[in-house]
Amino acid sequence: MSEGKLFYVIGPSGSGKDSLMRYGRERLAGDPGVVFAHRYITRPVELHGENHVALTEDEFDARLATGLFALHWDSHGLRYGIGREINLWLAKGCNVVLNGSREYLPEARRRYPGLTAILVNVSPEVLAERLRARGRETEDQISRRVARAKQFMHPEGRLEVIANDAELHVAGERLVQLLSDADASKRAFA
């Protein structure tokens, strides 16, 4: 059995990563070869937000101290972790999709050299509009996030780009195609 592939989805907050991953999860629900990893975050669960596991700071510290995270990082005052279960899934031949961090990508590549980064891109105007609509940031924070998104340089290594300015199903089908192609090529070489 060949090892699965790790897909590390990145993009600015408001680019639609959560919606895109939810679309992919629903479309590939019957495919045992593709697994979407949940993040562990020190943030309460929101009704229309990311499907994550909410942890307190103490819970996060305890999991970190016992080595339960394969990947972990801090961003915007929150802490994020990806459980070590992804290693089992990869070893079993599953392709694993996770919501990552642009800043943490070099460390993720060091730990998982074969990972494929998927950059979800949107125009600055669409990004600002989406951030305003979700209502979590002030205008100053929105301006800083848009500026940061413009400054992001494409990283070294394998990178797929998905434009997510249009209807969700367009970008969603692109993600499904990337994951399905990887699954098909893995089966061809098994």
Swiss-Prot record:
Q: Which GO terms fall under biological process for this protein?
A: 5-phosphoribose 1-diphosphate biosynthetic process; organic phosphonate metabolic process
Q: In which pathway does it act?
A: Metabolic intermediate biosynthesis; 5-phospho-alpha-D-ribose 1-diphosphate biosynthesis; 5-phospho-alpha-D-ribose 1-diphosphate from D-ribose 5-phosphate (route II): step 3/3
- Listed binding positions for ATP are 11-18
Q: What is its EC number?
A: 2.7.4.23
Q: Name one GO cellular component term.
A: cytosol
Catalyzed chemical reaction(s): alpha-D-ribose 1,5-bisphosphate + ATP = 5-phospho-alpha-D-ribose 1-diphosphate + ADP
**Could you name the domain of life of the organism this protein comes from?**
Bacteria
**Which molecular function term from Gene Ontology is one that the record holds?**
ribose 1,5-bisphosphate phosphokinase activity
Q: Which SMART domains match?
A: GuKc (SM00072)
Keywords assigned by UniProt, alphabetized? ATP-binding, Nucleotide-binding, Transferase
Q: Identify the PANTHER family for this entry.
A: GUANYLATE KINASE-RELATED, RIBOSE 1,5-BISPHOSPHATE PHOSPHOKINASE PHNN
The role this protein plays is: Catalyzes the phosphorylation of ribose 1,5-bisphosphate to 5-phospho-D-ribosyl alpha-1-diphosphate (PRPP).
Question: Family per UniProt?
Answer: Belongs to the ribose 1,5-bisphosphokinase family.
Instruction: Indicate what this protein is called per its UniProt record.
Output: Ribose 1,5-bisphosphate phosphokinase PhnN
Source organism: Thiobacillus denitrificans (strain ATCC 25259 / T1)
Q: What is the lineage of its organism?
A: Bacteria, Pseudomonadati, Pseudomonadota, Betaproteobacteria, Nitrosomonadales
